[in-house]
């Protein structure tokens, strides 16, 4: 299955099961959350005309080339008096323009005379260096649309408009579980044939960065009854996310439980790493099963699960930005699957890690993104390739 088809299917499933519950949170708690309703301006920005420069405010008609006396000083945060006819006002950046003034001359183009009057050295124009009322935003204008993920810029804009809290989509509740007798949690001694459970830490941290509420379901027991019990306790989550794969073998208790109390589809994705992917439901709860090799987990979560979770919160644009970068490597073997090579940019070119095995998480720690190599292509050094930064996938 092409990755585009898998994504299309997952997004359709997400659209059919949106998270509709919302809550109000303070701006300080809204980072990474999804706005639940349109944010509409309740005031003009700026609320009044103000100065864009440190300088002098005046009425253009009062200036005939002669120096003007300074009648007041206006600082940001202070209300000015109406401008006296035939005078100017010392004004500072962001301060309200006094009634009657219609332009500001920057202080660099003004000369203060011995008697305190100000001589303007350059021609003046109506409205120069003045920020008009409502220049940025007018009352009633849509400022941030529903379905927007809130970052520092959006939160700063909301604060500028006076919002102390925002209506956001409830956090997705995601249960993370691992499968595999070989897995041991870090800190415990390893037995023969065992490895530490790195995927759990990878996914829990990633989900938290995405604003999810994570339920750590641990490692599934090697027992069907206990697997049923574990899954049955996850009925209040929005997604069950497993790693380790689901097979058709008799010892695959997760697969058996899904088949008897839900539905299960095994997708063979035409990507590398990350060929096997599972989607199903257990007693109505969506289940996504990611491949167990760490690099495969990273790629399939970033390209498929992350968009699915964002779409369920109402985010429309869920795919990562892609950038065209010159290749600093040769990839001579054309594959039948789309490949995602762990890579990083150095000196204006993208270079790949020496070992692209799906079991090598160190390749991703070294990298700052992945190169997307299309099926049947053999990019050579200097060719333009597509690069997806981890910054587009992890946040």
Task: Describe each PLM feature range.
Residues 249-260:
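Short Gly/Thr/Asp-enriched flexible loops that form oxyanion-binding sites at enzyme active sites
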Residues 1-164, 324:
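Phosphate-interaction motifs
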């Amino acid at each position: 299955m092409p990755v585009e088809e898998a994504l299309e299917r997952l997004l359709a499933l997400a659209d059919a099961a949106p998270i509709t519950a919302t809550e109000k949170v303070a701006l300080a708690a809204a980072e990474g959350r999804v706005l639940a309703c349109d944010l509409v301006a309740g005031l003009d920005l700026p609320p009044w005309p103000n100065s864009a420069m440190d300088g002098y405010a005046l009425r253009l008609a009062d200036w005939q080339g002669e120096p003007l006396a300074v009648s007041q000083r206006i600082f940001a945060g202070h209300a000015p008096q109406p401008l006296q006819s035939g005078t100017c006002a010392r004004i500072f950046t962001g301060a309200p323009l006094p009634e009657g003034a219609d332009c500001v001359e920057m202080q660099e183009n003004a000369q203060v005379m011995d008697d305190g009057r100000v001589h303007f050295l350059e021609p003046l124009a109506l409205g120069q260096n003045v920020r008009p009322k409502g220049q940025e935003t007018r009352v009633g204008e849509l400022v941030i649309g529903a379905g927007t993920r809130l970052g520092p810029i959006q939160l700063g804009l909301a604060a500028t408009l006076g919002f102390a809290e925002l209506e956001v989509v409830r956090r997705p509740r995601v249960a993370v579980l691992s499968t595999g007798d070989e897995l041991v949690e870090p800190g415990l001694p390893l037995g023969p044939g065992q490895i530490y459970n790195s995927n759990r830490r990878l996914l829990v941290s990633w989900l938290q960065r995405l604003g999810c509420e994570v339920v750590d379901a641990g490692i599934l027991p090697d027992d069907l009854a206990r697997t049923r019990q574990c899954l049955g306790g996850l009925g209040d989550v929005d997604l069950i996310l497993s790693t380790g794969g689901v097979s058709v073998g008799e010892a695959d208790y997760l697969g058996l439980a899904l088949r008897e109390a839900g539905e299960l589809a095994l997708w063979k994705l035409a990507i590398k790493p990350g060929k096997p992917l599972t989607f199903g439901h257990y007693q109505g709860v969506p289940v996504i099963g990611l491949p167990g090799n760490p690099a495969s987990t990273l790629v399939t979560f970033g390209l498929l699960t992350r968009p699915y979770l964002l779409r369920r919160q109402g985010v429309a644009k869920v795919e990562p930005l892609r950038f065209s970068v010159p290749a600093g490597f040769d990839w001579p073997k054309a594959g039948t699957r789309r490949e995602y090579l762990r890579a990083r940019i150095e000196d204006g070119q993208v270079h790949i890690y020496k070992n692209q095995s799906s079991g090598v998480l160190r390749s991703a720690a070294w990298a700052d993104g992945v190169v997307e190599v299309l099926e049947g292509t053999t990019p050579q050094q200097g060719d333009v390739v597509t690069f997806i930064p981890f910054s587009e996938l992890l946040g």
